[in-house]
């Protein structure tokens, strides 16, 4: 599934903390996870696309930093995000 506006709105509505929330760490992690899964499938098909592979690694690093931030702030929120998104850890 491509990264369309509808998908983005759906993810924001699912992970938002309050009504006008678009930038909380939970929302950012959910959006990054969707982009990461999309790029992972792309890189599996196009093995020599190193530019996209680099972008994928950058996104994974951003998500890791956000997850560490949430983990340091509130462990319960961290566990909820991990279980909801199906991430390892």
UniProtKB/Swiss-Prot annotation:
Keyword RNA-binding: yes
Pfam families attached to this UniProt entry: Ribosomal_S15
GO molecular function, one term: rRNA binding
Example GO BP: translation
InterPro entries: Ribosomal_uS15 (IPR000589), Ribosomal_uS15_bac-type (IPR005290), uS15_NS1_RNA-bd_sf (IPR009068)
Keywords: Ribonucleoprotein, Ribosomal protein, RNA-binding, rRNA-binding
GO cellular component, one term: cytosolic small ribosomal subunit
SMART domains for this protein: Ribosomal_S15
The UniProt record lists the keyword rRNA-binding: yes
Signal peptide residue numbers: none
Cystine pairings recorded for this chain: none
Function field: One of the primary rRNA binding proteins, it binds directly to 16S rRNA where it helps nucleate assembly of the platform of the 30S subunit by binding and bridging several RNA helices of the 16S rRNA. Forms an intersubunit bridge (bridge B4) with the 23S rRNA of the 50S subunit in the ribosome.
Protein family: Belongs to the universal ribosomal protein uS15 family.
PANTHER family registered for this protein in UniProt: RIBOSOMAL PROTEIN S15, BACTERIAL AND ORGANELLAR (PTHR23321), SMALL RIBOSOMAL SUBUNIT PROTEIN US15M (PTHR23321:SF26)
Oligomer status and interactors: Part of the 30S ribosomal subunit. Forms a bridge to the 50S subunit in the 70S ribosome, contacting the 23S rRNA.
Protein name, entry field: Small ribosomal subunit protein uS15
